[in-house]
Amino acid sequence: MSGKYRGALNPVHEATYQFMGKLLQEVKDVFPDQLVHLGGDEVNFACWKNDAEITQFMEKQGYDYYAKLQTYYIQRIIKIVESLGKESAVWEDVAAKGQEGSVPKDTVIQVWRPRTWAQKMAQVTRHGLRTILSGCWYLDLISYGEDWPSYYRCDPHAFNGTKAQKDLVLGGEACLWGEFVDWTNLLPRLWPRASVIAERLWSSEDTPDMEDASVRLGEHRCRMVRRGIPAQPLHPSACPFLPV
């Protein structure tokens, strides 16, 4: 792309897929992980809308909206990943309503929208797709007061679905985006709130008692502070044997 519209790759050029094949080969060579995350969220279609070649391609293919073009692109990229013996993960945008069948069954869908995650988890698992939840756990978002209880209460299985659907939930992942986070505030923004999410995801279902968790996580926060980690308070409190 040239001009002021930059960002998305051109999905109608074969050179795009040649480049991505080489890039993903490097990813395979460097990282042993089986799962490769391909992204796919919040794609800005402005550059595609202003490219005559793309418009002509869409007309030829019968694509009436740009999400279909994105589906075409991601399908080809997933095939490259498969040829390398890896599996793909994508953001929920790729499996938009009506497009769930556009990705292979072994694709992992990461659900990120906070307000609609339960509906989306039900939707993608109904189509037999595995999923990871992030919609509850955005650590870059801050609020006044105690925000950790909402992280702790979130249950990735709390959506309308069968046992078979809920068996497709692999777990969850906390996200911390960097628009307003850098080295000056990363650690206090991250800790101990990430510990709250870790306990929720790695504990049995019968460990949801908030009062016990509050005491336990408060102690853990003090443990981190004693070790030199600038973990922010979870609630009004003071760590013993520390300056106040």
Locations of regions flagged by a protein language model:
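Active-site neighborhood of glycoside hydrolase catalytic domains
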Residues: 1-108, 112-129
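Flexible, acidic glycine-rich loops studded with aromatic residues
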Residues: 88-96, 100-244
